A protein has these predicted regions:
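Sec-dependent signal peptide recognition
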Residues: 1-8
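Bacterial signal peptide processing site
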Residues: 18-20
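Aromatic-rich carbohydrate-binding modules that target alpha-glucans
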Residues: 23-73, 81-107
């Protein structure tokens, strides 16, 4: 419960409310896009590679993208300027540390 409150508080610090989050699928390749125009750095971690941090790429509109993900089930979260961020995702799953991760389910 306390960890959940901390995550909610961090969301407020990052941008006032949860950033918009979009999933795009092209030819079975998944791209996740996070709208966080004021962020300096965004990293992505997923269960695909044991939550190894990988940098997201920022475009001119402040959207951060992580491309080339397989269209398979996985859990994930972002680090925005060093702070854990769960966007407003459709599915969430409890992690092993008392918090939660977003969960992607193939379409």
């Amino acid at each position: 419960m306390i960890r959940t409150l901390l995550v909610v508080a961090m969301l407020g610090l990052v941008g006032g409310c949860a950033p918009r989050h979009t999933v795009m699928i092209v030819d079975q390749s998944v791209t996740l896009i996070l709208q966080a125009p004021n962020a300096s750095t965004v990293q992505f971690a997923s269960s695909i590679d044991r939550f190894k941090l990988r940098p997201a790429t920022k475009d001119a509109q402040g959207n951060w993208a992580v491309a080339g993900l397989g269209n398979q089930e996985f859990q994930y979260f972002y680090l925005v300027d060093g702070q854990v961020l769960l966007p407003d995702c459709r599915y969430r799953q409890a992690d092993d540390f008392g918090a939660a991760n977003c969960r992607y389910l193939p379409r």
